Swiss-Prot record:
Gene name as annotated: rsmH
Gene Ontology annotations for the cellular component aspect, listed alphabetically: cytoplasm
InterPro entries: RsmH, SAM-dep_MeTrfase_MraW_recog, SAM-dependent_MTases_sf
Family: Belongs to the methyltransferase superfamily. RsmH family.
Organismal lineage: Bacteria, Pseudomonadati, Chlorobiota, Chlorobiia, Chlorobiales
Organism whose genome encodes this protein: Chlorobium phaeovibrioides (strain DSM 265 / 1930) (Prosthecochloris vibrioformis (strain DSM 265))
Function summary: Specifically methylates the N4 position of cytidine in position 1402 (C1402) of 16S rRNA.
Enzyme class of the recorded protein, top EC level: transferase
Protein name, as recorded: Ribosomal RNA small subunit methyltransferase H
Localization of this protein: Cytoplasm
Amino acid sequence: MGGMKSCYHEPVLAPESVSMLVRGPGLYLDGTLGGGGHSLAILCELERSGWLEGSLLLGIDQDDEALQEAGERLADYREHAVALKGNFGNIAALSAREAGSRGMEPQASGILLDLGVSSHQLDVPLRGFSYMQPGPLDMRMDSGATGTAADILNTAPEAELASIFFRYGEEPLSRVIARAVTTRRVEKGPFHTTDELADLVRSVVFGRERVMKSLSRVFQALRIAVNQELEVLERVLGDGVMLLKPGGRMAVISYHSLEDRMVKRFFSSLTTADWGPKGVGLREPVRPAAAIAVTGKPVRAGAEEVARNPRARSAKMRVIEKMENRE
């Protein structure tokens, strides 16, 4: 099992996430299976602790390449692990179907979400996620889905493009870049490749550091728009908490401020009781807290991990535990 050559990078914050999630046998959901690194770490910990029997891990991904890689990596645990093709926004239906087919209740002991684009996807030019190398302007995480980054770039009105760059990329020059995109469409025709978009950004943003930041923001914004990432994240957070059994935990690893703010805000709403309007002086909360925060501040990767895997530098992990029912 060890020593398998893989083009997928090591999973971010694997020891930390596993130590906080795995506390007994049960149903574990990896909503972002990727190459299977986190799932393998969870299964290994279940086996090491004597909890593998009676446990099931369901890994979800919409990327066919990732599913193939994960299937090979998890082959030794095929009795206890299933790789499912799908969007993690449908985690409730997917887990209910698969767990039900095995006679298990779809109540999870642990849920892991490792958000954003994988290092492998960034490294493959044909996926079109990176401005670092030329490739088609695709950016679909599910290659069978409709609607690419090129489709948005070539058809969206200027105001819509500016909104996408600002909302999803927090790009301060969103209007300038959007105007340049629409002007270029008229003068030179549609965009087809990542380097065409990168060259356009370089033509209107000045200063090496500012250019690099704008490139990252614009490509991030298009990727989020293509895959509707924030809308899907909102859905999976809500459904995920419903799937957790009392005492079950959810760990979410985010890589940019938009994701982290959403996760932080949602977790805060669960861990904070609602005592109603100020001054009423209620003895019981209107709505008690539904979870407790396992992590106060987000868990960050250490210097050694960042040196091995630079992507881990921006990672933040937040963990909550669903509270016991109090009826």
